[in-house]
Amino acid sequence: MKLCVTVLSLLVLVAAFCSLALSAPMGSDPPTACCFSYTARKLPRNFVVDYYETSSLCSQPAVVFQTKRGKQVCADPSESWVQEYVYDLELN
């Protein structure tokens, strides 16, 4: 009898964990990159080749610029030069 109760309890726990894992929405992984500070200087536009915005799960919003040399630089999305670069990159 004790064995049945133990096995049944274990099965209920496994089912609960599987249910939680399967019910998570696709793409709900934790953010892979968050910025905790912004660059203090404006990047030269010809250094920037791409950008992405950080996840809304991050503590502060940021635009991450990727440079020709493969560096990633965090920038404040409220700065006018950042908005200008994003607009320009979207057009190209």
From Swiss-Prot:
Disulfide bonds join 34-58, 35-74. One of its GO terms (molecular function) is chemokine activity. PANTHER family: C-C MOTIF CHEMOKINE 4-RELATED, SMALL INDUCIBLE CYTOKINE A. Interacts with CCR5. Transmembrane segments: none annotated. Chemokine that induces chemotaxis of cells expressing CCR5 or CCR1. Inhibits HIV replication in peripheral blood monocytes that express CCR5. The gene is CCL4L1. Belongs to the intercrine beta (chemokine CC) family. One of its GO terms (cellular component) is extracellular space. Detected in B-cells. Coiled coil: none annotated. It comes from Homo sapiens (Human). Keywords: Chemotaxis, Cytokine, Disulfide bond, Inflammatory response, Secreted, Signal. This is C-C motif chemokine 4-like.
